[in-house]
């Protein structure tokens, strides 16, 4: 690691002036990006005039925009990798030029790029074969292992001794005000400081990589456990929930146990640091004795001062520890207890960073001590050849004294940092033990727990608490300020969310229970997100270790909410079918009552009870009777005065009575009977079956198309892999990777289409179940109205035996047909799942080979970047002790109608799309 840090002394400044001006690869990427930007802008500029359009923009267009962001990130990453490759090649060429012609190259600058890790420092440059063989080329200097010398010292070592001596007597520089000797010392000092920082950076990076790997391992374990829980709940139809008190206790216990484990590891590391520091102290003492043997004189004031400072630090530590114990002896509420745990977690994270810095400092001390001992050894070897009172010997002893002083100062820093680390570890350990003991004694503070009710009340309560608490504790004040800002921001967000929910409720007009559940979940998530954004961003990645149990509880709650939403949607669907049946029955009953009503309404207007006034004799009168079949009859025109005699009028009156009686009998005959009602229901089911078969055949036909596309893409991918094995090289790999990216995008599109197909198939399954329930209801109705007597004539409310048997046969045939359709649909689902699994496997393989991140990893990476908006983190306090949302005034309930459940919210279909249909057949298939 030290060698890799020291190898960064070479410069890439020369390579920064060279750029690729013409590149087909770059042109292709820019053109592709321009097209994607235009398409994305077109999506963004679309207007959502209605709720349906806004829902479509959110659930259809939003994934496309997310996909564009992912593709843009991958393109940027490819450009960065290409630039890194070119920079490495140019750096190698510049290194070769500097080695061949050192007198023509100025001193290089300090290199910050630590990615150039040459595993073999003795390996010659790549392009030395281009130099003529007769050229006198000096050898490349090796990277020093025990000491680090700057590039300027390496160049000066090639010069003649006379030139070096003449340079020592040069005049002071005007710009810096230093002589050449002082400048060389300053350069050497700065290079050593750079080496220390680079070493510390390497240790921090290695620790970060280990923590990052462990974080994703824990993430995968949590996902596997959640999948296991969901599968068991779906299999047995049960749902287990943990009580709030038990959940808080578990989360607090897990957080404290994680802190204790980390503190124990840090204590072991600190003990090892102490042992290493003792070894280095012995080596420094040995070097001091050897230097005293050369000089016969040494002072120890620094060590005494260090001891006095150490005693002062111990006394201050005891006072801090006592004050800490006094603070913890007070009664803690829920919020105070959560804040104490947060402070402990932040302190443990900072201690981990301090331990890494201490490791790098100890490494630097070891290297400096080795350099000092080598220098003393060289002086002792040359002591016999030099005169004791010569100027050269005095200068070398003076240099040894300076180096020894630097090493002692560095050792003093190591000692101070080690003592400070030990002090903070002891304090953190005692705090963790005290919090563990007070875990069961924490009082439930309901007033503070409901911090989402009223921001003004919370501010007043905070003022009272500030007056009662100790004013010197800045941590409590900071926590209260954060809480006030969080409450204000949360109230604003909740008001905006309430307005959005009211608009959604007005547009949908139903599903109030589902909306309230979704509103509560979204408000809670928003509060957690706001609290996490207000926390400091230092050490957040390491904090995920402690908050992993919180994340699992949040994920469990999220799954439970999804399950409840699916149950509500299923109930609404069942209610829709029941309402449809009731609506059909009511429609038939209303038609019968309508006929009776019109028949009774026309009776007083019969000619026997009185004709209208003779003034209306010139106008033709007509009587219309409304019916669902649109049947009507017309009255003939009345006779004019003086045209007919009294006898003829009486005859026409009698004829009209007979005609009206015939019409009333025909209307009576058109009243639907029970048999006609059952026949109409069966015909309606048959029409629905025809429409369902059309959709089902189209859906099943798509599976074969997906299968053919996947096989073709796999064949093309195998060709590309064989071509890649035949042509080995970086340029060929880049070209083949560009050829494989369209296949990767096509596979991702197929995966998305398969997921949509599975969701649509789940809807078809629900329709089959509803149709089966309809058939069962029709069968029960037929059984109920079947005539038990063997009479030849039955009433309109009964069905003859042979007609009932005929109906039962038709219903049985439709049930068998329904079962066959279900089996075909189940086979299609199994085939689609297998095809989706195969596509997932191929996509994962491509992502590993091409270095492409999927959407989840890209979002995680973007959230981990400092420039991102911040990862939505979960506050420990919220899930330890819970929160209460602001109570809003209830909106006046709208009048519920039978059409309120006809169009469920599209958000439910989107949120419940993760539900996988059961592999077993439903009960109605078994019974049929």
UniProtKB/Swiss-Prot annotation:
Residues 110-119, 457-468 have a biased composition (Acidic residues). InterPro entries: NAB, NET2A-D/KIP1-like_C, NET2A-D/KIP1-like_dom. Residues 489-506, 642-651 have a biased composition (Basic and acidic residues). Disulfide bonds: none annotated. Residues 622-634 have a biased composition (Low complexity). One of its GO terms (cellular component) is membrane. Residues 207-309, 360-445, 547-574 form a coiled coil. This is Protein NETWORKED 2B. It comes from Arabidopsis thaliana.
């Amino acid at each position: 690691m030290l060698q890799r840090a020291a190898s960064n002394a070479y410069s890439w400044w020369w390579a920064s002036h060279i750029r690729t001006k013409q590149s087909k690869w770059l042109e292709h990427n820019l053109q592709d990006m321009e097209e994607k930007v235009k398409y994305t802008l077109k999506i963004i500029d679309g207007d959502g005039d209605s709720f349906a359009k806004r829902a479509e923009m959110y659930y259809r267009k939003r994934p496309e925009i997310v996909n564009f962001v992912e593709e843009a990130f991958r393109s940027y990453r490819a450009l960065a990798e290409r630039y890194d490759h070119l920079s490495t090649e140019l750096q190698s060429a510049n290194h070769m030029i500097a080695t061949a012609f050192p007198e023509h190259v100025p001193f290089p600058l300090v290199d910050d790029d630590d990615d150039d890790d040459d595993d073999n420092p003795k390996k010659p440059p790549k392009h030395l074969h281009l130099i003529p063989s007769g050229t006198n080329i000096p050898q490349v200097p090796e990277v020093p292992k025990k000491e680090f010398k700057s590039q300027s010292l390496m160049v000066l070592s090639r010069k003649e001794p006379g030139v070096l001596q003449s340079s020592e007597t040069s005049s002071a520089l005007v710009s810096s005000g230093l002589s050449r000797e002082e400048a060389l010392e300053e350069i050497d000092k700065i290079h050593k400081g750079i080496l220390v920082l680079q070493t510390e950076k390497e240790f921090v990076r290695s620790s970060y990589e280990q923590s990052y790997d462990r974080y994703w391992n824990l993430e995968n374990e949590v996902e596997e456990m959640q999948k296991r829980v969901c599968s068991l709940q779906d299999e047995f139809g049960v749902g287990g929930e943990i009580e709030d008190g038990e959940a808080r206790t578990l989360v607090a216990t897990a957080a404290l146990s994680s802190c204790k484990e980390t503190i124990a590891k840090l204590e072991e590391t600190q003990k090892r640091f102490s042992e290493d520091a003792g070894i280095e102290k012995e080596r420094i003492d040995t070097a001091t004795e050897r230097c005293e043997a050369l000089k016969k004189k040494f002072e120890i004031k620094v060590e005494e001062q260090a001891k006095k400072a150490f005693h002062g630090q111990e006394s201050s530590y005891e006072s801090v520890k006592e004050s800490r114990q006094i603070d913890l002896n007070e009664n803690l509420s829920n919020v105070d207890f959560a804040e104490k745990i947060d402070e402990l977690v932040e302190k443990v994270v900072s201690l981990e960073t301090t331990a890494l810095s201490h490791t790098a400092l100890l490494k630097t001390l070891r290297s400096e001590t080795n350099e000092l001992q080598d220098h003393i050894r060289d002086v002792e070897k040359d002591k016999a050849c030099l005169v004791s009172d010569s100027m050269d010997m005095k200068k070398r002893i003076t240099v040894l004294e300076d180096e020894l002083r630097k090493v002692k100062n560095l050792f003093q820093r190591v000692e101070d940092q080690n003592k400070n680390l030990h002090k903070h570890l002891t304090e953190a350990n005692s705090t963790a033990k005290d919090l563990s003991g007070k875990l069961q004694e924490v009082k439930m503070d309901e007033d503070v727990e409901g911090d989402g009710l009223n921001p003004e009340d919370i501010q007043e309560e905070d003022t009272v608490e500030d007056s009662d608490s100790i004013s010197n504790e800045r941590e409590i004040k900071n926590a209260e300020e954060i809480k006030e800002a969080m409450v204000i921001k949360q109230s604003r967000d909740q008001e905006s969310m309430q307005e959005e929910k009211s608009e959604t409720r007005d547009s949908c007009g139903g599903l109030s229970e589902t909306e309230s559940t979704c509103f509560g979940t979204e408000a809670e998530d928003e509060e957690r997100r706001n609290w996490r954004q207000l926390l400091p961003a230092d050490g957040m990645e390491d904090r995920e270790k402690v908050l992993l149990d919180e994340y699992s509880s949040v994920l469990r709650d999220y799954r439970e909410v999804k399950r409840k939403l699916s149950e509500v949607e299923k109930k609404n669907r069942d209610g829709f079918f029941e309402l449809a049946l009731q609506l059909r029955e009511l429609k038939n009953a209303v038609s019968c009552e309508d006929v009776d009503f019109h028949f009774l309404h026309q009776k007083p207007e019969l000619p026997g009870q009185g004709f209208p006034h003779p003034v209306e004799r010139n106008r033709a009168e007509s009587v219309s009777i409304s019916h669902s079949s649109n049947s009507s009859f017309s009255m003939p025109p009345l006779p004019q005065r003086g045209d007919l005699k009294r006898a003829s009028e009486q005859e026409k009156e009698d004829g009209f009575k007979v005609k009206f009686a015939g019409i009333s009998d025909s209307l009576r005959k058109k009243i639907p009977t029970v048999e006609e009602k059952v026949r109409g229901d069966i015909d309606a089911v048959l029409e629905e079956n025809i429409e369902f078969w059309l959709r089902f055949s189209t859906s099943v036909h798509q599976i074969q198309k997906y299968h053919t596309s996947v096989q073709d893409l796999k064949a093309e991918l195998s060709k590309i892999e064989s071509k890649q094995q035949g042509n080995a090289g970086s340029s060929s790999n880049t070209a083949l990777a560009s050829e494989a990216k369209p296949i990767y995008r096509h596979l991702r599109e197929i995966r998305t289409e398969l997921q949509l197909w599975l969701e649509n198939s789940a809807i078809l399954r629900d329709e089959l179940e509803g149709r089966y329930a309809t058939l069962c209801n029709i069968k029960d109705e037929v059984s109920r109205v079947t005539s038990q007597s063997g009479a030849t004539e039955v009433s309109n409310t009964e069905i003859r035996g042979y007609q009932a048997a005929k109906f039962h046969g038709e219903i049985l045939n439709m049930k068998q047909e329904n079962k066959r359709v279900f089996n075909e649909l189940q086979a299609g689902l199994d085939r689609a799942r297998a095809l989706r699994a195969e596509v997932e496997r191929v996509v994962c393989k491509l992502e590993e080979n091409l270095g492409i991140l999927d959407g989840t990893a890209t979002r995680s990476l973007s959230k981990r970047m400092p420039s991102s908006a911040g990862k939505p983190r979960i506050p420990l306090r919220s899930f330890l002790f819970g929160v209460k949302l602001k109570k809003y005034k209830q909106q006046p309930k709208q009048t519920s109608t039978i059409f309120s459940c006809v169009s469920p919210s599209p958000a439910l279909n989107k949120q419940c799309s993760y539900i996988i249909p059961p592999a077993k057949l439903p009960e109605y298939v078994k019974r049929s």
